[in-house]
Amino acid sequence: MPELPDLAAVAAELTRRLGGRRVIAATAPTPILVRATPEDLGALPGVTIDGAERRGKFLLLPLKRAGKIERMLAVNPMLAGRFWITGSAERVRARTGLRLQLAGDEDLRYVDREMLGKLYLLGPDRLNDIPGWSEMGPDADAHDLTLDVFRQRIRRHPGELKPLLRNSKFVAGIGNAYSDEILWTAGLAPFRRRSTLNSDDIDRLYHAMRDVLTHATEQLHVLVPPDIQTQHREILQVHLRGGEPCPRCGRELRQIGGREATTFCRTCQPPM
């Protein structure tokens, strides 16, 4: 599932390639993926894509008319949702949720082979209508998420550290992969409970979160390919590397779980 660094890179690429492009037609070949009526889509011709933004695990495309944002396209790609920029004459793939035909004979298409993603087309003042939006905490890389704010917020969220980092009510944008990376960098076990952390542990967790996300975002801005597929995560130190040597101590990394695997080092990340 794309996380904060992946989506930041995709948003930058979408902005570079689509900023200022005019929509001439909009359809939903697989309408179950799109929270919009045919009338909503029919009103889009003439709007301009004003780049792309990211909030939590959502991509946001502001759609402007006469210099004013008229609609927001909010996309949570989940496990397999992908954007494609392709020629308008290209065959429309199965499970294409949204097709925006652009001036210049190109399309922006959203394809989701797992049919799990969600697209919302709504007014710019209606984002709170998206389930869970109003409860979302600050982005994990937000400038105003200072160390002091982090200390205050973490006191309100009990439980194990890995689910805590993945809880969008605490901080938004972190999923299974980067929670492993952050906890390994901080030297904290994923199953350790927040109540066992001292002030130094909390500070170390905060700085690890910021460092890991900053580094990954910088790397993915370089690696993101022209077709806007998220890059395979060679940049990750430990996630899904169970059985390999720990990059820090050389001991074997342990991995548990299946599709939602957790990878950690029992030496570098002691239980307490």
Feature roles, as predicted:
Residues E3-D6, V10, G19, N128-G132, ...:
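Alpha-helical structural motif
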